[in-house]
UniProtKB/Swiss-Prot annotation:
It comes from the Bacteria. NADP(+) binds at residues 167-169, 192, 233. This is Bifunctional protein FolD. PROSITE patterns: THF_DHG_CYH_1, THF_DHG_CYH_2.
Length: 290
């Protein structure tokens, strides 16, 4: 049986945030440039509120300026777009993030398209998606960026490895595949319609699970010794009526088969905000020509 090592995303993210804070201090000292991140929250979604609170705390901890805009759930689309335009024009704001999901009456794609691509620190704008696809410098979605950072840290050179990404979302699956291609992996994108999904997964040296289905990837889907990146965050009921967090991979089954695996929680999750700060720092530098 293989001894499976958990990948500690929390520790890696803490180190990344510390390095970002050092770089921000140098920017402030040498260029009088304090990177600024604006976060826009529409409505009262509890999970979004917690996430925004965490973002604000970590932004301040990194020495960046944090701007929060909390709008009521019934905000008109024109008013939200006007705020985005105002932030696009504000030189103190280097990164703009509109927290998703938006209330149903707002067109998410239209709102995201209104953000200046140079300030699109979520990496969701079609310009950034297109730049990533053709191999140009782009602001990249935070979660897949964090996944690839963890992979490079633990595996070193990824060139030639077979990578299977289960999930084809614009937020994780597609950009993760693009980033792995950039590292010279041989990449397969699989999804719910893939024929013989377990067999496809068994070919993977790197298996990225990003489908949003609790424990869908079973232990016998994993190639012995493979590295498993579990992006899923799912709440499932416990016998006592409470809930627990699980990923898209059956973690207990993966132990003894995978070589490395990200646990849920504590794996990929902490990397997302750290990479948001990295993107804000990158955006600030590019806007100032540094």
């Amino acid at each position: 049986m293989i001894e499976t090592k958990p990948i500690d995303g929390k520790a890696f993210a803490a180190g990344l945030r510390a390095r970002i804070a050092e770089e921000v201090a140098v920017l402030v000292r040498d260029h009088d440039l304090k990177p600024g991140l604006a976060v826009v929250l529409v409505g009262e979604d509890p999970a979004s509120q917690v996430y925004v609170r965490n973002k604000a705390a970590q932004t301040a901890e990194a020495g960046m300026a944090s701007f929060e805009y909390k709008l009521p759930a019934d905000t008109a689309e024109a008013d939200l777009l006007a705020l985005v335009e105002k932030l696009n024009a504000d030189p103190a704001v280097n990164g703009i993030l509109v927290q998703l999901p938006l209330p149903a009456h707002l067109d998410s794609m239209k709102v995201l398209a209104a953000i200046d691509p140079a300030k699109d620190v979520d990496g969701f704008h079609v310009v950034n998606a297109g730049r990533l696809a053709v191999g140009l410098d782009a602001l990249v979605p935070c979660t897949p960026l964090g996944c690839v950072m963890l992979l490079k840290h633990h595996l070193g050179n990824l060139s030639g490895l077979n990578a299977v990404v289960v999930g084809r979302s614009n937020i994780v699956g597609k950009p993760a595949a693009q980033l792995l291609l950039r590292e010279d992996c041989t990449v397969t994108i699989a999804h719910s319609r893939t024929r013989d999904l377990p067999g496809m997964c068994r070919q993977a040296d790197i298996l990225v699970a990003a489908v949003g289905r609790p424990e869908m990837v079973r232990g016998d889907w994993i190639k012995p010794g493979a590295t498993v990146i579990d992006v899923g965050i799912n709440r499932v009921p416990k016998a006592d009526g409470k809930t627990r967090l699980v990923g898209d991979v059956a973690y207990e089954e993966a132990l003894g088969v995978a070589g490395l695996i990200t646990p849920v929680p504590g794996g990929v999750g902490p990397m997302t905000i750290a990479c948001l700060l990295q993107n804000t720092l990158t955006a600030a530098r590019r806007q100032k020509g540094l």
